[in-house]
A protein has these predicted regions:
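Beta1/beta-strand and adjacent pyrophosphate-binding region of the FAD-binding site
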Residues: 4-17
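N-terminal Rossmann-fold NAD(P) dinucleotide-binding loop
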Residues: 20-21
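Glycine-rich FAD pyrophosphate-binding loop
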Residues: 26-47
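N-terminal FAD cofactor-binding segment of flavoenzymes
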Residues: 40-77
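Dinucleotide-binding Rossmann-like beta1-alpha1 core, especially the glycine-rich loop
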Residues: 82-103
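Predominantly flavin-linked oxidoreductase catalytic cores and closely associated redox partners
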Residues: 109-254
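FAD/FMN-dependent oxidoreductases across multiple families
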Residues: 234-314, 318-320, 327
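C-terminal helical "tail/cap" subdomain of flavin- and related membrane-associated enzymes
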Residues: 316-409
Length: 409
């Protein structure tokens, strides 16, 4: 029988990704007794996210320069085929974060504001006992830690370690949509790096990555991120991601002798309409655990941070009101609707567009349609492209085009 020890706190946050790390630091700042745990023993490891963000997010979410890998001011879209289009701005448009540094910084902030951080702890299960949550965590040596808390937050990402997957959808198209990604961190020559610096480059079209896309993002001088991502299509046999990324490297970096510093990857799993329960009693979901990853660009960091900005004040109110006669469910009843409002009305539109675009992108006909859409962007400014890809402002390109884009025509 593994030995067991126990801890008490007001809020236990399971998962030190962008969502959990941000919530823990916000709550600690407000004087809440918070414990942040993660199964990783080192937050530098498994830095699976390519972590591209628009520049405004740095200020909106109060992120420091130390978490930035590089800045970019240009979009470059390669494909379908060999067509290359680029849009440049004189100003920085965004950043590529060092994902490990972001997680470390958040955990460090939580500690500095008086919170507790415990790594190498895997949450196994949780249940409610009266008005407290009891969560069992396993250490690498098999011993157990029992944490009793007023609230437990499942910020374990797409794994949804405590909340579990949403109940089977009434309509099959409302279920979880999955995307799989693989990324290599490459050491390249400075001459090679300079060709890709300052820009986000995406490869689009079925001859690059069927049902998905590839990318090269710059990090600090001499380091690039090379990645592939695609929607999982159970109806189709899909080529292995390892083969696709090797081929991408061969085509984009011809003749370059690069060193692979790290290989990482992961899954993104989200529902399109985000109607799943966000809470079960005193267990609350945050970030990817409640489908805040957007499937159009596999982008979830901003939205994970948004979910914690919404939840933090509501949790504080709920803690302040503890003892009053409101139930846990009532105390956080505004969470899901407020988060839906914060993500905006274009959210599920972008998800449907993602499903249609990526799943359909496996043949020349779809490449032709994509090429037409990209041609329509030729006269845009780089800032307009950011508004489209980060702000999901499809209506700018004509409401008449939307039914076509969404597959209603
Ligand atoms: C290949 C790839 C590329 C991406 N690129 C981008 C990008 O460019 N821009 C962008 O915005 N987003 C990107 N994303 C998505 C983004 O990384 C996620 O949406 C974001 O990290 C979600 O944050 P989170 O905190 O909700 O979950 P996560 O970041 O997944 O964090 C969850 C944490 O919980 C821990 N955990 C899981 N289970 C347990 C358990 N049982 N016990 C304890 N701890 C546990 C994990 O170790 C992890 O640290 C990418 C994703 C992938 C896979």
């Amino acid at each position: 029988m593994p030995s067991e020890s126990s801890l008490h706190c007001q809020v236990l946050v399971v998962g030190a990704g962008p969502a959990g790390g941000d919530l823990a630091r916000r709550l600690a700042f407000q004087g809440v007794d918070v414990i942040l745990v993660d199964r990783l023993t080192d937050l530098n490891r498994s830095a699976f996210s390519s972590a591209a963000l628009p520049i405004a997010s740095m200020q909106v979410f109060g992120l420091p320069a130390e978490v930035v890998g590089s800045r970019w001011r240009q979009w470059q879209l390669i494909g379908p085929g060999s067509a290359t289009r680029s849009w440049a701005s004189p100003q920085p448009l965004g950043v590529v974060l060092d994902f490990g540094a972001l997680r470390r910084w958040q955990a460090d902030q939580c500690l500095r504001w008086g919170g507790r951080v415990a790594l190498g702890l895997q949450a196994c299960c949780s249940h409610q006992e009266g008005e407290r949550m009891v969560t069992l965590l396993r250490r690498a040596d098999g011993t157990l830690l029992r944490v009793s808390s007023d609230w437990t937050v499942d910020a374990s990402g797409q794994a949804r370690a405590l909340l579990g997957d949403p109940p089977p959808a009434q309509r099959p198209r409302d279920g979880l949509v999955r995307a799989a990604g693989l990324e290599w961190l490459l050491q390249v020559s400075l001459t090679c790096w300079e060709r890709w610096a300052d820009r986000l480059s995406f490869c689009l079209g079925s001859d690059w990555v069927p049902q998905g896309y590839g990318w090269i993002f710059p990090m600090q001088p001499g380091v690039l991120k090379l990645g592939v991502c695609r929607l999982v299509d159970p109806q189709r046999q899909q080529p292995p991601l390892g083969r696709l990324i090797t081929e991408l490297g061969r085509r984009l970096l011809p003749g370059e002798v690069f060193k692979v510093l790290d290989r990482h990857g992961g899954l993104v799993r989200s529902t399109i309409r985000r109607r799943e329960p966000h809470q079960r009693g005193r267990l609350v979901g945050l970030g990817d655990a409640v489908s805040t990853a957007n499937l159009l660009g596999g982008e979830g960091i901003r939205h994970a941070l948004t979910s914690s900005a919404v939840l933090a004040p509501l949790l504080q109110e709920a803690l302040a009101a503890s003892g009053a006669s409101t139930s846990a469910q009532q105390a956080l009843q505004d969470y899901a609707p407020q988060l839906r409002r914060a993500l905006g009305w274009r959210w599920s539109l972008s998800g449907r567009l993602a499903r249609r675009t990526w799943l359909g992108l496996h043949e020349a006909k779809a490449d032709g349609r994509l090429d037409q859409v990209l041609r329509g962007l030729d006269g845009c400014r780089a800032e307009d492209l950011s508004a489209l890809l980060f702000g999901y402002r499809f209506e700018r390109y004509g409401l008449r085009a939307m039914p076509y884009l969404l597959g209603w025509r």
